[in-house]
Amino acid sequence: MSAYAREMRVLCISGKRFAGKDTLARLLVEAAGRQGITLSTYAFAGESKRMFAAARPEVELARLLDDRAYKETWRPQLTAFTVESLAADPLVFVRAVMRRIQAPALITDLRLRHELAHLCTVCEPQVVRITRNDEHRAASGWAFDPTKDTHHTETELDDPSLWNEVVHNDGSEAALAVHADALLSRWLARSDAPRSDR
């Protein structure tokens, strides 16, 4: 476990598909940067790609992370690797992320109760739930899919008692940026929050 764990809180973003998780993460990183703090981002889903690439030397990790067409060529093998890895250890990617955390951290894709339960044993996660109404989600490309939208990865963290903060994303990106700044300021006001790198 990294020295970072237990000493500081980790921000974790939870939310439905097309709620704006990645956008909020980017805005939080930008807000932290303006205050001289490097906020590193981690994703459990991304960790499966890292581990897959480590096991397959012919796979280019950078392209797997950022090149959609390239990722599609490897999707069947990546999916099989992910399923097999999770069957062997449901926390394999969570543990891998926590071993790498060495700085103020933002987890961008908290989805499952057992992920949160594990985080609570090794650090102090602060769960930020981002919400967005269906009209705005649809404007970004969301369409209800009963298979995806009722899957446990979309619903396990619907209980508000699991959230520390709620960010409503029903306006512009500029409005969301204001929420991100306020959220970061509240986090930094805590005695155990990270301080400026400057």
Regions found by a protein language model. Give the residues of each.
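ATP-dependent small-molecule kinase phosphotransfer cores
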Residues: A43-A105
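Conserved lysine of the Walker
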Residues: K21
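P-loop (Walker A) phosphate-binding loop of NTP-binding proteins
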Residues: G15-K16
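Small-molecule kinase domains that catalyze NTP-dependent phosphoryl transfer to phosphate-bearing small molecules
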Residues: L91-V92, I130-R198
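Post-Walker A helix-loop "phosphate-sensing" segment adjacent to the P-loop in P-loop NTPases
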Residues: E30-S40
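ATP-dependent NMP and nucleoside kinases share a basic, alpha-helical "lid"
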Residues: R95-A143
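Hydrophobic positions on the alpha1 helix immediately C-terminal to the Walker A/P-loop
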Residues: L24
